[in-house]
């Protein structure tokens, strides 16, 4: 079971459940993700209560290896975005996982 929820589908859900028109729903979804992106660009942590946290992490340079030649190649330092799920989200996912294992 590998189903993906897209931004377009989120907008459709807002249209159906909240009653926004399709344009407003699309703009709301786009605006939501744009705010998260801008906050991360400013170096801020994004905390969504009951869902999780998006944080920036600086990874130092480290040695890597070319898998074909075995030659050591440095992997440059970089900044990455990490996501840590909240305990509520972890518990909900675990509950679904446990329920699907029941006969």
Curated annotation (Swiss-Prot):
UniProt cross-references to PROSITE patterns, sorted A to Z: HISTONE_LIKE
UniProt xrefs under HAMAP family: IHF_alpha (MF_00380)
Chain ranges passing through the membrane: none
GO CC annotation: cytosol
Subunit structure of this chain's protein: Heterodimer of an alpha and a beta chain.
Species of provenance: Aromatoleum aromaticum (strain DSM 19018 / LMG 30748 / EbN1)
Described function: This protein is one of the two subunits of integration host factor, a specific DNA-binding protein that functions in genetic recombination as well as in transcriptional and translational control.
GO molecular function annotation: DNA binding; structural constituent of chromatin
Name the record gives this protein: Integration host factor subunit alpha
Record family assignment: Belongs to the bacterial histone-like protein family.
Protein's GO biological process: DNA recombination; positive regulation of metabolic process; regulation of DNA-templated transcription; regulation of translation
């Amino acid at each position: 079971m590998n189903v993906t929820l897209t931004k377009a589908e989120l907008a459709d859900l807002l249209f159906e459940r909240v009653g926004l028109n399709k344009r407003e729903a699309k703009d709301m979804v786009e605006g939501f993700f744009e705010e998260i992106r801008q906050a991360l660009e400013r170096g801020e942590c994004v905390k969504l209560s009951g869902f999780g946290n998006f944080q920036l992490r600086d990874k130092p340079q480290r040695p890597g290896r070319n898998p074909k030649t075995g030659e050591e190649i440095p992997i440059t330092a970089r900044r990455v975005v990490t996501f840590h799920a909240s305990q509520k989200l972890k518990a909900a996912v675990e509950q679904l996982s446990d329920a699907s294992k029941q006969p």
